[in-house]
């Protein structure tokens, strides 16, 4: 359409030029024009007024000869001038045609460049849409990652709580293991002492005691198998948790790699867009330079100003469109820069999230290391008081005839305990090594990244739970001590208020076999009662020592525990014939810096589960000074 309008305009301009030339050119006679178009022959019959009638040719010729030559000369000079003017005008017309052709070519080039720019703009818009879609996908992936992180944190908290419970159980089992080892060593010593003091008991009683000890051994074996099975289950759960963490980590790394690849492709596309923009800017600068170049000077006689003005307007319009395109390209470049900044911010956020996740894995590994140390002995804690009570009963009841059988049983118990300790330690070490190689490092009790609200709230909840647990432990310890004191007072009151004074005399003289005339059976019963009183008094004394050592970690004796000198003096006077079964365990508990809290909870649980363990009597400390006076 544009070319047709241009052709129409050129045809109209040519018509106007012809009309203008016809109006301004002087009129020439038709005969002169015809004679001019011939081969240069001068007509003889041409006159100023037209053709004359044929008359006397000779007279007419000779009569009008000088006038016709003058008129011919006068006519030839303007004709020549007009011919020159026509030649110059034809040259100018050819020049104008050439300029019009060059302008048409420039216009075609400009239109071609505009079409290319439109295509480039369309491509840029498509790329922009693709970038927006990719940004939306990145945001969706970011939200998915956040949800995955939240679920991982919840699972980590759940496993942390489990590991804390396991650590507490392991700590109690370690304590009871040391106590049992010390108890076994004390049992051997006390059995040797009692071999010299005790008389031979009846065969029926010894057989019954042996059967009871065998039953207790069977129960202990069953408990050992249960403990081993529970330990294996804990190891399997731990390995499964480590594998789960590995899978989560690998999946998260794959997502990060995909996102990094997408970011690289976006950067490449952006570089390509920038190159295209630079090319367009160069082409625009070239076009501006071409437009700024001065056109060739127009001849003054060419009347094509309307067409030139129209062409100038079209060029101005094209220049305005190009400037608008340049502005649009600049705006697109600004938008691309903003998108680049957003992408960089997203990369920084993702990097920070990755660092936080790595720190959490490291802290989890650091927390798993101390938990594996306390993992083994936790399972032995339940049967600790049972073993101690069983050893005490064996100490009181076994006689001289079955000392060898009792020593063999004690050796079997020690072998079982050593077997429990050795595979537990071996498995624990291997488990620690395998965790150090495989499992991701766990979170410490105090999180390092306290900037996030979730970490801060979880840390505060952890501290509150810890404080509540410590308060509960203290309350249970106080209740346990109060209960044991009341029970000891009741038992001693019952023994002292027994009619006939048999219990008092038996308690006083049973240890040294001073029963008198009442017979050997009463003396033996009284000696057993006295031994039970002394053993339980030592147990209470050792338990108070243990509580004092737990509350005073600086190896200072507690206010309720007696001094070592007093204990030694009491042993010299013969008050306490029995050795405390828990003194060495208490010393180990004092020396061990990991045992910050007493084992009140398992003791209370065992006492509630087995109420018959504490059926024997206990003598308080104020009765110790009374016993030697009665013996004297």
Curated annotation (Swiss-Prot):
Golgi-targeting domain as annotated region, ranges: 529-632
GO cellular component terms given for this protein: cis-Golgi network; Golgi cis cisterna; Golgi cisterna membrane
Feature: compositional bias, Gly residues: 508-520
Region span, Disordered: 1-77, 352-383, 423-445, 496-524, 550-569
Keyword presence, Coiled coil: yes
Keyword Membrane in record: yes
A Pfam family it matches: GOLGA2L5
Stretches with biased composition (Low complexity): 555-568
Biased composition (Basic and acidic residues): 352-362
Location(s), subcellular: Golgi apparatus, Golgi stack membrane
Bias-annotated ranges (Polar residues): 38-50
Family: Belongs to the GOLGA8 family.
Name of the molecule in the record: Putative golgin subfamily A member 8I
The organism of origin for this protein: Homo sapiens
